[in-house]
């Protein structure tokens, strides 16, 4: 059985200032389908701040407010997931990590036992950073770094990032009509990793750079990452279920012909 981590970003899960319920439903349906095809799936989900904002519209530019919104929104987000997974007779669980959990072998070991047990019992772990006490991903990263660490330390074969960025291109496709998709990337240049990040929207804190940093981390540890659109899931379905690489970008240190 192949183990994967799927990370969905804020831009995919939010629409008009609240949770995009149809996109969330499509994501849950994808995970249910993957499980039928013998995948173990853990989900790293953003969206807590957006969910909290629907109940208390605080200024999101203030870090303390974002922490408060995340605290309000996290249980709301989980409830939405629980209702949708129940339609497929699936249980989901909430797993919150503090930023320093991956700095301790003991903490990683304990967390892995919990994740392994959940997956062995057909439960979908829904993972997020505990934004009330850990603010780095809340400020910058949109869980890209967290998802890479989850994939590595919990022995996933692949990290799938579903984003408003549907692939890596040789130049900015928003500015250049002749931009070409890079289907497979074996190495990321240092200047690509050091470029200034570009926030996606009012709820998102990442951009292509944090995704490249996640991919670079995984490739250096012998693991792979697939970047694809979270708005239209045909590319990720083709890649994971049909074994066809029609869209998106695969980051792998293994050269493929």
Swiss-Prot record:
Job description of the protein: Catalyzes the transfer of a phosphate group to glutamate to form L-glutamate 5-phosphate.
GO biological process: L-proline biosynthetic process
Leader sequence residues: none
Primary enzyme class: transferase
Name of the protein in question: Glutamate 5-kinase
Catalysed conversion reaction: L-glutamate + ATP = L-glutamyl 5-phosphate + ADP
UniProt-listed Enzyme Commission number(s): 2.7.2.11
Lineage: Bacteria, Pseudomonadati, Campylobacterota, Epsilonproteobacteria, Campylobacterales
């Amino acid at each position: 059985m192949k183990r994967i981590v799927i990370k969905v970003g804020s831009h995919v899960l939010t629409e008009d200032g609240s949770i995009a319920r149809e996109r969330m439903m499509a994501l849950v349906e994808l995970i249910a389908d993957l499980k039928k095809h013998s995948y173990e799936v853990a989900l790293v989900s953003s969206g807590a701040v957006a969910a909290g904002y629907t109940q208390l519209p605080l200024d999101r530019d203030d870090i303390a407010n974002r922490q408060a919104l995340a605290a309000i929104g996290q249980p709301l987000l989980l409830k939405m997931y629980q209702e949708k997974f129940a339609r497929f007779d699936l249980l989901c669980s909430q797993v919150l990590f503090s930023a320093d959990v991956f700095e301790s072998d003991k903490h990683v070991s304990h967390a892995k036992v919990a994740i392994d047990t959940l997956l062995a019992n057909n439960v979908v772990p829904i993972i997020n950073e505990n934004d009330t006490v850990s603010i780095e991903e809340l400020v910058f990263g949109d869980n890209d770094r967290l998802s890479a660490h989850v994939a590595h330390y919990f022995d996933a074969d692949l990290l799938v990032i579903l984003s408003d960025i549907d692939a890596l291109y040789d130049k900015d496709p928003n500015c250049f009509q002749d931009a070409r998709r890079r289907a497979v990337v074996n190495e990321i240049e240092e200047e690509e990793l050091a470029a200034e990040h570009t926030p996606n929207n009012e709820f998102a804190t990442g951009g292509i750079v944090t995704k490249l940093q996640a991919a670079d981390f995984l490739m250096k540890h012998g693991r792979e990452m697939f970047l694809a659109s979270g708005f239209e899931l045909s590319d990720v379905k083709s890649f994971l279920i049909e074994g066809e690489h029609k869209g998106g970008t695969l980051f792998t240190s293994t050269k493929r012909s």
